[in-house]
C-alpha cells in the first residue's frame, strides 16, 4: 500500500513538471499533498499531548516514505543525495520537538514542512530533467502585518529583490500559504491559501497572468442537472466575482480581489485537461449582453416583512438593516416595495432572534427550502432582451423574489428547491444554448 502511494506521488510530481515545462518565465507556487498535511497534523497532536513515542513513530514512517519517494523519483545519484539531505533538514525541524517544549503555536512550524518538502523535491526533479530552477522560501518574502493581513508593500519589495538576485533564472519554485507574521514567527495566511499566495506574487511582479491549476472547472450551469454544461472560456472580473460567491471552491475571493486591484488576468486551468485553454478572467468585457452562466445557492430562507406602520417607512427599512447587522447576519438578496421588504439569507444562526425583534414592527412570512438562481453575464440595463427571455423561460415557475445586481452582471431569482432543477434546465435551453 505504501509503495502504491509513493508511485502515485511520483506520477503526480512528474505531471506537475510537465505542466510547467514551457519556456515562459514563471514563479510556481506549490501546496503540500493533503495526506502529508494530515499526517503532519497528527504528529503535532501527538507532541501536544506529550505522546512522544507515538510522535516518533509517525515522524519515522513519513520520513522513510519521503526518502523512498526521492529514491524512486530521482535517478542521478548526486542529485538524489542532495534531495535526501534536504528531506532530512526538513525533518530535523520536526524532530527537535522531541527535546523541546511543544506549544499549540508550534503546530504551524511542523505543518509548514509539508510545503517545504514538496518544493524541495520538485526542484531537484526539475534539475535532473534539465530545467534550471531556484527554490525560494516563502518565509523570506511573504509576511503579514500586525492586523494579520498580508503586508503587500513588503511582499512586493522582497519579491523584486529576490528576482533581481537571480537574473539568469526563469523558473522559481516557492510554497503556498506559509508566511512569517509580524513577530517573525511561522504562520499561515489567514485565508486564500496557495491561490492567494500566487495572487500576491503575481501582482508584485506585474505578471502577464496568474495561472491557477484546479480540478474545479467553471461551468455554465450545474453539471448535476445539466450534464452537457460548457466550460466558460472568458469572464470579466465582476462576472467571476458573482460566480465565486455561489461556488467559492472555484477560486478564493481574496485571490480574485488581489488580481483585480492590479488588473492582472487570472487563467483557471484543469491539470487533468492540460491542453484546454481553461477560463480566462480579466477586465475585458467580451460578448456584450451575453449570458455566461447560471449559478445556484441552496439552503436559502425567504422572509417577507410587511410593515405594521409602527415606524415610518424610512425607519422601517433602517430597522431591518440594523437588526440584521446587530446579529451579523448577511442577506444574500434584498428587495423592497413601499412598506414591504423581502430578504433571502443562507444564515439561520440568529434568525429566530432577528424575527423576534422585528415582530414588533412587521407581519412576517418565512419559507424554508428555497434556492437562489443567478443568471450571470454582461447585462446592461439598456438591454431588456435578457430579462424578457428569463421571464419567458420561467413563466410556469413561481418566483418569490427578483433582484438585479447593481453592477449589471446578474439577475437573481428565488425559487423553491423543488423547482430548481426544472428552472435550471429551462434557463439552459432558452438562454445558454441560444447564446452559444
Identify the meaning behind each predicted range.
Residues 277-436:
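A conserved regulatory-domain signal marking ACT and ACT-like small-molecule sensing domains
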Residues 141-142, 217-219, 274, 339, ...:
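Positions that flank functional sites
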Residues 239-282, 287-309:
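A conserved active-site cap/scaffold subdomain adjacent to cofactor or substrate pockets
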Residues 3, 7-251, 255-256, 416, ...:
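Nucleotide/pyrophosphate-binding catalytic subdomain
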Residues 25-28, 67, 109, 132-134, ...:
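Structural motif
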Amino acid at each position: 500500500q505504501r509503495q502504491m502511494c509513493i508511485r502515485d506521488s511520483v506520477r503526480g510530481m512528474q505531471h506537475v513538471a510537465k505542466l510547467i515545462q514551457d519556456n515562459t518565465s514563471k514563479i510556481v507556487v506549490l501546496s503540500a499533498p493533503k495526506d502529508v498535511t494530515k499526517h503532519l497534523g497528527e504528529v503535532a497532536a501527538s507532541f501536544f499531548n506529550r505522546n512522544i513515542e507515538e510522535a516518533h513513530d509517525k515522524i519515522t514512517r513519513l520520513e522513510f516514505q519521503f526518502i523512498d519517494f526521492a529514491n524512486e523519483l530521482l535517478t542521478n545519484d548526486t542529485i538524489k543525495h542532495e534531495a535526501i539531505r534536504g528531506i532530512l533538514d526538513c525533518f530535523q525541524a520536526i524532530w527537535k520537538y522531541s527535546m523541546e517544549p511543544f506549544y499549540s503555536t508550534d503546530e504551524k512550524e511542523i505543518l509548514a514542512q509539508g510545503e517545504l518538502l514538496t518544493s524541495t523535491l520538485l526542484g531537484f526533479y526539475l534539475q535532473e530533467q534539465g530545467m534550471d530552477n531556484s527554490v525560494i522560501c516563502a518565509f523570506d518574502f511573504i509576511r503579514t502585518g500586525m492586523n494579520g493581513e498580508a503586508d503587500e508593500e513588503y511582499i512586493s519589495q522582497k519579491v523584486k529583490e529576490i528576482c533581481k538576485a537571480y537574473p539568469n533564472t526563469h523558473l522559481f519554485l516557492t510554497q503556498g500559504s506559509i508566511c512569517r507574521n509580524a513577530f517573525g514567527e511561522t504562520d499561515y495566511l489567514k485565508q486564500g491559501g496557495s491561490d492567494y499566495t500566487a495572487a500576491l506574487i503575481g501582482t508584485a511582479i506585474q505578471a502577464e497572468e496568474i495561472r491557477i491549476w484546479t480540478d474545479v472547472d467553471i461551468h455554465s450551469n450545474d453539471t448535476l442537472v445539466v450534464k452537457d454544461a460548457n466550460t466558460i472560456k472568458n469572464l470579466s472580473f465582476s462576472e467571476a466575482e458573482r460566480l465565486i460567491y455561489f461556488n467559492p471552491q472555484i477560486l478564493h475571493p481574496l485571490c480574485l480581489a488581489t488580481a483585480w486591484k492590479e488588473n492582472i488576468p487570472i487563467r483557471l486551468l484543469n491539470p487533468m485537461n492540460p491542453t484546454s485553454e481553461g477560463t480566462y478572467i480579466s477586465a475585458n468585457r467580451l460578448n456584450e449582453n451575453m449570458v455566461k452562466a447560471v449559478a445556484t445557492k441552496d439552503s436559502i430562507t425567504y422572509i417577507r416583512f410587511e410593515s405594521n406602520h409602527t415606524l415610518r417607512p424610512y425607519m422601517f427599512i433602517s430597522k431591518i438593516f440594523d437588526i440584521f447587522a446587530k446579529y451579523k447576519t448577511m442577506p444574500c438578496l434584498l428587495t423592497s416595495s413601499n412598506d414591504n421588504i423581502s430578504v433571502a439569507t443562507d444564515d439561520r444562526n440568529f434568525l429566530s432572534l432577528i424575527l423576534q425583534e422585528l415582530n414588533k414592527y412587521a407581519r412576517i412570512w418565512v419559507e424554508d427550502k428555497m434556492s437562489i438562481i443567478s443568471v450571470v453575464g454582461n447585462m446592461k440595463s439598456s438591454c431588456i432582451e435578457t430579462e424578457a427571455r428569463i421571464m419567458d423561460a420561467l413563466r410556469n415557475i413561481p418566483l418569490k423574489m427578483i433582484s438585479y445586481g447593481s453592477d449589471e452582471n446578474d439577475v437573481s431569482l428565488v425559487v423553491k428547491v423543488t423547482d430548481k432543477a426544472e428552472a435550471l434546465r429551462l434557463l439552459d435551453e432558452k438562454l445558454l444554448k441560444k447564446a452559444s
